[in-house]
Swiss-Prot record:
Residues 195-206 have a biased composition (Basic residues). Belongs to the krueppel C2H2-type zinc-finger protein family. Transmembrane segments: none annotated. Binds DNA through the consensus sequence 5'-CAATG-3'. May be involved in transcriptional regulation and may play a role in tooth formation. GO terms for cellular component: nucleoplasm. It is found in: Nucleus. This is Zinc finger protein 22. GO terms for molecular function: DNA binding; zinc ion binding. A zinc finger (C2H2-type) spans 55-77, 83-105, 111-133, 139-161, 167-189. The modification N6-acetyllysine is found at K18. It comes from Bos taurus.
Amino acid sequence: MRLGKPKGGISRSSSQGKVYENQRKTGRQRQRWGMTVRFDSSLRRLRRGLDEKPYKCVECEKSFSQSSTLFQHQKIHTGKKSHKCADCGKSFFQSSNLIQHRRVHTGEKPYRCDECGERFKQSSNLIQHQRIHTGEKPYQCDECGRCFSQSSHLIQHQRTHTGEKPYQCSECGKCFSQSSHLRQHTKVHEEEKPRKTRGRSLRAKTHSLSSWKAGKGRRSAAGLR
């Protein structure tokens, strides 16, 4: 008895057993690297796992695993920011960046911590916050082994080993390893400016008074003659 063609447009080759295809939207499958994987999202994940990046940028030769990622990257070279905020007019390369920016205007905080209920505008901020509860410190210093919950804290710490001081005071040229230390330092200059201004004003007033007295004395002497 001859069997009819299976539903869903599936074609099989029992002799080879290599290719399995399902033309329905949810089901295209192929056998690769000794395993059967979903052709859409699973294959893209497998490509990333194997570091396969077939899509290359002609401008900088940077490679990507997905064509959509390459398309977004190319906007950096063209300078085209096609996603514009209707509230302030600021433009962005990617729609996801515009969505994040819009939360500045709306105040929306869609990411909620299950432990304490605090909300955040970005998922990355929530992930960093959750490490307060879990105690996770995934960033380790290669020099001393000290661990940190945020990569920015590790970068700041590493400057204690390298001696790097990238933040320079525009007033006196003094350098600092952290931006917070520079901000504290600039307050010293801000406090000095009013004192200098008051000092200059006092000297100017004293000089004017002395000049006035001297002039008055000369006029009096001339009158006596």
